[in-house]
């Protein structure tokens, strides 16, 4: 599948424990790779021997009603986050798709979606997502609003008011 991805993160101890400082989300079959770091993210494309490199940026979206919402699995998300709360978000979103895993985070970071929710992640899954998402201007926390590396869940959004709105809905 074109959206099978490879994740890689480089960590460094900045004085408060190890955390990711540089990462990559790559989709080899599609010839695309996102690289993120504190303060930036870039999209590399290699198609038919032609290589291009462009800055990545989340798109402007401030309301769930205007958002494209992605999850890895509807069943897993509903079971673990709480069916009625998740269903309310689904009903409010402009568009809802169960097309997640690392492609969902890539979609938010590259401006193709606005919200990605994953209630069950491993450390090695989320570590590579953080620099790419944040470097593109997005926000990524756990579903409770905490550190996704420690709580092993993630809410990724285009940022600001949208992120707060999603967290309020999930934790109501």
Report the location of each language-model feature.
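Hydrophobic/proline-rich hinge and linker segments of small-molecule sensing/allosteric domains
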Residues: 42-45, 49-50, 65, 69-71
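DPxDG-like acidic metal-binding loop motif
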Residues: 1-43, 47
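Short, surface-exposed loop motifs enriched in S/T, G, D/E and P with embedded aromatic residues
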Residues: 49-58
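An extended, acidic
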Residues: 57-172
């Amino acid at each position: 599948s074109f959206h099978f991805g490879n994740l890689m993160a480089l960590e460094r101890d900045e004085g408060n424990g190890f955390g990711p400082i540089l990462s990559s989300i790559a989709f080899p079959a599609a010839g695309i790779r996102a690289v993120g770091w504190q303060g930036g993210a870039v999209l590399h494309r290699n198609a038919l021997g032609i290589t291009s490199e462009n800055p990545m940026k989340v798109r402007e979206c401030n309301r769930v009603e205007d958002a494209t919402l992605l999850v890895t699995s509807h069943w897993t998300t509903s079971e673990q986050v709480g069916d009625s709360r998740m269903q309310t978000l689904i009903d409010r979103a402009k568009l809802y798709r169960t097309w997640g895993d690392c492609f969902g985070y890539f979609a938010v970071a590259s401006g193709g979606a606005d919200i990605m929710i994953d209630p069950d992640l491993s450390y090695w899954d989320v570590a590579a997502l953080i620099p790419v998402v944040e470097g593109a201007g997005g926000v990524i926390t756990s579903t409770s609003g905490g550190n996704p590396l420690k709580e092993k869940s993630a809410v990724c959004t285009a940022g600001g008011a949208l992120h707060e709105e999603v967290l309020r809905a999930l934790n109501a």
